[in-house]
C-alpha cells in the first residue's frame, strides 16, 4: 500500500491518521496535547502511548508507535507556568527540561 492508516478514539472523539511513506511523514510540527489532572493520568497516557514501539522524548513529549507526536502534561505544570511568582515558573521549567515523562511531585521546590 501507499500509506499506513490508523483509527483511534480519544475520549469519544474519533481520529483517522495516516502516514504516506515518503510523501507525508509525521513530525513535531503537529502534536496532540493531553492535559492530565494528576500523576495517575500522566502515567496512564504515557504508558499507553509509548507501548508497542512508541518512544519517549524530552519535556513530556513522546511519539506513539505510528510516529505521531504527543505532549502529556499535568495541569499543575500549566498552573505553575502561568504563576505570578517568577521563581515558581522558573523552577517548574528547569525541572521539566530535565525530565522525559513529567513527574508532578518534582515540579515545585520541597
Residue ranges and their predicted role:
Residues 1-56, 63-110:
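Glyoxalase I/VOC metalloenzyme domain signal
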